[in-house]
Amino acid sequence: MTDLTTSDSLQPAWQTRDHLDDPVIGELSNRFGPEAFVVQATRTGMPVVWVKREQLLEVMSFLRKQPKPYVMLFDLHGVDERLRTHRQGLPDADFSVFYHLLSIERNRDIMLKVALSEKDLHVSTATKIFPNANWYERETWEMFGITFDGHPHLTRIMMPQSWEGHPLRKDYPARATEFDPYVLTKQKEDLEMESLTFKPEDWGMKRGTENEDFMFLNLGPNHPSSHGAFRIVLQLDGEEIIDCVPDVGYHHRGAEKMGERQSWHSYIPYTDRIEYLGGCVNEMPYVLAVEKLAGIVVPDRVNTIRVMLSELFRINSHLLYISTFIQDVGAMTPVFFAFTDRQKVYDVIEAITGFRMHPAWFRIGGVAHDLPRGWERLLRDFLDWMPKRLDSYVKAALQNSILKGRSVGVAAYNAKEALEWGVTGAGLRATGVEFDVRKWRPYSGYENFDFEVPVGNNGDCYDRVMLKVEELRQSLRILEQCYKNMPEGPFKADHPLTTPPPKERTLQHIETLITHFLQVSWGPVMPANESFQMIEATKGINSYYLTSDGSTMSYRTRIRTPSYAHLQQIPSVIRGSLVSDLIVYLGSIDFVMSDVDR
């Protein structure tokens, strides 16, 4: 579902559209009247509708209950509009909150926006319509100071409870050098430690019943089964989990704030570190979103190279996930086999990009350089090696009766629950929903590849891990097609906003030299607009929503990651289960905390 036009590859590919022809605009107009909202033209590929604050919940409920409903709150966050200069035709706003809704049946999205005055930063909570709004509203309050009236627990989520200020406001410093030196006194240390003490009453929990007390157990933030700096406070009756509270933010780096201080090109290395196992997969949505802003169409060779690198990193990530899941259940050996196989993936990646985990290799309009001589042999060796190894993982470990006994039927949820909590990727497909962005909304030429989308039926831990095995096989299938059908042609687009121009042209045309000088000094200037790109990342759907104000840097960079939604779902799934089941459930989610905390 894109606005890509291919009739003339020399013209800008991404047109600014208002999507007034989208059926949902007619449905909203018939129900609320055309005067009730303002439609914004963007390059996001979806209708963007400003609604009145008083009607927001009514509009969301209406869309939620349509015959083809918008069943998922995909994203929710805010924007500080005070310094934005290109706002012609939009409602007056000091701040805005956006709600990105997704419909599976329509395969369409819509973005609702609400304008807010700095003197009245209040909007009603959406948690009664979409339960996963909880964490998103907490983060939006924390970062912008926007209060969501009626929210069950509006507290900080990324920053320490003692933090002062709202970091994503434009008047909040972006550099550490703009702050006074931090001094940790004994008094401060005591206050910080006190703030980490869990108080059950704050979360509506009881300390016990008439007959016995509950135990409150900290799992993490340094427990090996929490897979990173992640803390879950468990309310236990013996081994049974009565309730739990996930505690995130220990890995927060301010990635979205960094996007406001880096040029469009220099931000690419930061994207690698959002989900540090994904490598080039993380670069894909960012560069595609910037290319929409710039109106760049990349050559077919670039598309295929990007797909090839993305699938190599997908295999690399899935191998680690499968082996650590097996380790969480109690088997050690497969982890060592997996690292042998992952090294073979890295051999190919390093030969092509020059780096391993964080190559920062994709460029706006292309890739850093062409494929090296001999890449075919390296890829061929890996494609000949991996299928048999994958079979051995299944036979030796995943078909083991003990592993199946620990994971079949454990931490199961259905499609309705998955959509309510914003679950994407294998976690959603394990419930029977065949939603894979590579198939449903192809990008970077995925529509030219022949592959299947594995789906499950039970939505349990075992289904989730077996889906990843099948996804590995499909990634190998895609790589085989890259090997056999790599197009000829340039590795970058011939566009003034992309990679440096050919040297011979700079020696003939002074205008080209001036453009090149500006690009490498200040950085490229992107047209004022908004763009959006989602991709099928290693752990679910990852997306970038970019706002340009006609500058060398992004005005607002919103990064939606899959792991954030997946961890928010934990309490609803694990209540009533045992602690041992929680360990298996955490291992089946496939998350890293950099992807959660950004």
UniProtKB/Swiss-Prot annotation:
| Keywords assigned by UniProt, alphabetized | Cell inner membrane, Cell membrane, Membrane, Multifunctional enzyme, NAD, Quinone, Translocase, Transport, Ubiquinone
What Gene Ontology cellular-component terms does the record carry?
A: NADH dehydrogenase complex; plasma membrane
**Reactions the enzyme catalyzes:** a quinone + NADH + 5 H(+)(in) = a quinol + NAD(+) + 4 H(+)(out)
What is the membrane topology listed in the Swiss-Prot or TrEMBL record? Peripheral membrane protein
Q: Where in the cell is it found?
A: Cell inner membrane
Which GO terms label this protein's molecular function in UniProt? NAD binding; NADH dehydrogenase (ubiquinone) activity; NADH:ubiquinone reductase (non-electrogenic) activity; quinone binding
- What Enzyme Commission number(s) appear in the record? 7.1.1.-
Region NADH dehydrogenase I subunit C, residue ranges: 1-189
Annotated segments matching region NADH dehydrogenase I subunit D: 213-598
SUPFAM superfamilies recorded: HydB/Nqo4-like (SSF56762), Nqo5-like (SSF143243)
Q: What does this protein do?
A: NDH-1 shuttles electrons from NADH, via FMN and iron-sulfur (Fe-S) centers, to quinones in the respiratory chain. The immediate electron acceptor for the enzyme in this species is believed to be ubiquinone. Couples the redox reaction to proton translocation (for every two electrons transferred, four hydrogen ions are translocated across the cytoplasmic membrane), and thus conserves the redox energy in a proton gradient.
Matching HAMAP family:
NDH1_NuoC, NDH1_NuoCD_1, NDH1_NuoD
Which family does the entry's similarity section mention? Answer: In the N-terminal section; belongs to the complex I 30 kDa subunit family.
Query: What's this protein's name?
Result: NADH-quinone oxidoreductase subunit C/D
Organism for this UniProt entry = Yersinia pestis
Give the taxonomic lineage as stored in the record. Answer: Bacteria, Pseudomonadati, Pseudomonadota, Gammaproteobacteria, Enterobacterales
